[in-house]
A protein has these predicted regions:
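Short S/T/G/P-rich N-terminal loop/turn motif that feeds into the first structured element of a domain
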Residues: 1-70, 76, 80-95
Length: 95
C-alpha cells in the first residue's frame, strides 16, 4: 500500500451498525485500494476516528465521491459532510 492516514467523521448510527457498513463496503474499498487498519468511536458516540491505508490519495477521493458509497454511508447514519482526513501517518505500532 502507498499511504496511511487518520480520518474522522460524525455519525448517528451505533458503532456496531457502522461496522456492518464497513463490511458491506468491502467490494468498493477493494476496488479503490482502501483498507481500514483501526477504528474507534468517540466517548460520546458521535464520531469515528480511523486509521486507513490506501494505494493512492486518488483512490481515497474516488471512494468518498462514489455515489453508491455516499448513499450507503448516508443511509447507515454517517454524516458524509463531516468526513475529514486529519493527517498522513508515517510509522506506527499496534500494541
Amino acid at each position: 500500500m502507498g499511504m496511511r492516514f487518520i480520518g474522522s467523521f460524525k455519525k448517528t448510527c451505533s458503532f456496531e451498525d457502522w461496522l456492518k457498513l464497513v463490511d458491506s463496503l468491502k467490494p468498493q474499498m477493494d476496488k479503490h485500494g482502501l483498507k481500514l487498519i483501526f477504528a474507534t468511536e468517540s466517548e460520546d458516540g458521535t464520531s469515528i476516528y480511523d486509521v486507513g491505508e490506501a494505494a493512492t490519495m486518488k483512490g481515497v477521493q474516488a471512494f468518498l465521491s462514489d455515489p453508491e458509497v455516499r448513499q450507503m454511508r448516508v443511509d447507515a447514519g454517517v454524516d458524509i459532510d463531516s468526513q475529514e482526513v486529519i493527517s498522513a501517518v508515517g510509522k506506527f505500532n499496534v500494541f
